[in-house]
Amino acid sequence: MRKLADYGRDDHPAEDPERAQLAWTVALLDDCDECDGLRVELTVEEVGSPGAGLVAHLAPATARRLRAALARALREMGEAEDG
């Protein structure tokens, strides 16, 4: 089973010749035979190149660590936390 949680694109201009615009998806995954239990699947790939990206299978603790890192970066740039 793979259940999509959210998807989107980064906010970098598509016309920048030095940096590719990226797409991301976050999903819940339970069919990773090598993984022990449920995983949060994070996929990052260049816009227009579906299937050619990088996929991370994050255990709950690792997903929480990533969430905390994103929250810390937002705080450092002066953004209020949601919720």
What are these regions (language model features)?
Residues 1-83:
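Positively charged, low-complexity terminal tracts
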